[in-house]
């Protein structure tokens, strides 16, 4: 029997690198706030959506939902001071025995194929992340210089990173470490075992700079 599927959308950034007058998850993209595009992508594929937002963004989000008549069902949870704390808060309302996909709120171009592939493999493996092969040359910085490395041995990691909910919640009970950059690093540090990887869609970029936003507009309207 297929496990229920939850999306945990984390949207705690303030978008300083975007240089905008509001957090990047609320910037308009093809007529809708970025975050609404993200929730729309997940809605057909999950049984429930948990949205983690800073407390001081809740009223503004409610105002946007009214303004744009946004009707995708979701539960809003208060974020923490770090992404780690925000995910941990969100996991408190996700039950055991389900699959949970943790996704960056500012990745509005994740494909249906990527979402489904992460959930499907998580049914078998319990821990999955989408990734993309490296296309640029890589160099390693050291105290005595910098060195070329074999890029074929590296990938970039995307979200949604998808887990058995009870496993991820257990991993998030450990103390925070500075090198916890994503859910995979939290999971691997606690359990000492790797996650399975799938190839994510190339359009699944994280909107960080004005160039990213311009590219996302082109991809959505092309």
Swiss-Prot record:
Record's keyword annotation contains tRNA processing: no
Keywords for the protein's UniProt record, in alphabetical order: Isoprene biosynthesis, Nucleotidyltransferase, Transferase
EC number(s) per entry: 2.7.7.60
Catalyzed reactions: 2-C-methyl-D-erythritol 4-phosphate + CTP + H(+) = 4-CDP-2-C-methyl-D-erythritol + diphosphate
Superkingdom in the source lineage: Bacteria
The protein's annotated pathway: Isoprenoid biosynthesis; isopentenyl diphosphate biosynthesis via DXP pathway; isopentenyl diphosphate from 1-deoxy-D-xylulose 5-phosphate: step 2/6
Signal sequence segment: none
Single GO MF descriptor: 2-C-methyl-D-erythritol 4-phosphate cytidylyltransferase activity
CDD domains xrefs: CDP-ME_synthetase
Annotated site residue numbers, Positions MEP for the nucleophilic attack: 151, 206
Repeat listed as a keyword: no
InterPro entries attached to this UniProt entry: IspD (IPR001228), IspD/TarI (IPR034683), IspD/TarI_cytidylyltransf_bact (IPR050088), Nucleotide-diphossugar_trans (IPR029044)
SUPFAM superfamilies: Nucleotide-diphospho-sugar transferases (SSF53448)
Matches recorded under Pfam families: IspD
GO biological processes: isopentenyl diphosphate biosynthetic process, methylerythritol 4-phosphate pathway
Annotated site residue numbers, Transition state stabilizer: 17, 24
Top EC group: transferase
Entry similarity comment: Belongs to the IspD/TarI cytidylyltransferase family. IspD subfamily.
Protein task: Catalyzes the formation of 4-diphosphocytidyl-2-C-methyl-D-erythritol from CTP and 2-C-methyl-D-erythritol 4-phosphate (MEP).
Name of the protein: 2-C-methyl-D-erythritol 4-phosphate cytidylyltransferase
Organism per entry: Porphyromonas gingivalis (strain ATCC 33277 / DSM 20709 / CIP 103683 / JCM 12257 / NCTC 11834 / 2561)
């Amino acid at each position: 029997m297929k496990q229920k599927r939850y999306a945990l959308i984390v949207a705690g950034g303030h978008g300083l690198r975007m240089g905008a007058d509001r957090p990047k998850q609320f910037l308009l993209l093809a007529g809708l706030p970025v975050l609404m595009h993200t929730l729309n992508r997940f809605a057909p594929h999950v049984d429930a959506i948990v949205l983690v937002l800073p407390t001081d963004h809740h009223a503004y989000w409610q105002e946007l939902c009214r303004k744009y008549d946004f009707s995708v069902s979701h539960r809003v949870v208060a974020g923490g001071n770090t992404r780690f704390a925000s995910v941990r808060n969100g996991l408190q309302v996700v039950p055991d025995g389900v699959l949970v996909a943790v996704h960056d709120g500012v990745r509005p171009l994740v494909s249906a194929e990527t979402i489904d592939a992460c959930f499907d493999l998580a049914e078998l493996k319990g821990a999955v992340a989408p990734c993309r092969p490296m296309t640029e040359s890589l160099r390693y910085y050291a105290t005595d210089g910098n060195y070329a490395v074999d890029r074929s041995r590296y990938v970039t990691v995307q979200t949604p990173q998808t887990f058995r909910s009870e496993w991820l919640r257990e991993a998030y009970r450990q103390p925070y470490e500075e090198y916890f950059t994503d859910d995979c690093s939290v999971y691997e540090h606690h359990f000492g075992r790797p996650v399975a990887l799938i190839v994510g869609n190339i359009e699944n970029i994280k909107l960080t700079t004005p160039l990213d936003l311009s590219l996302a507009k082109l991809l959505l309207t092309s």
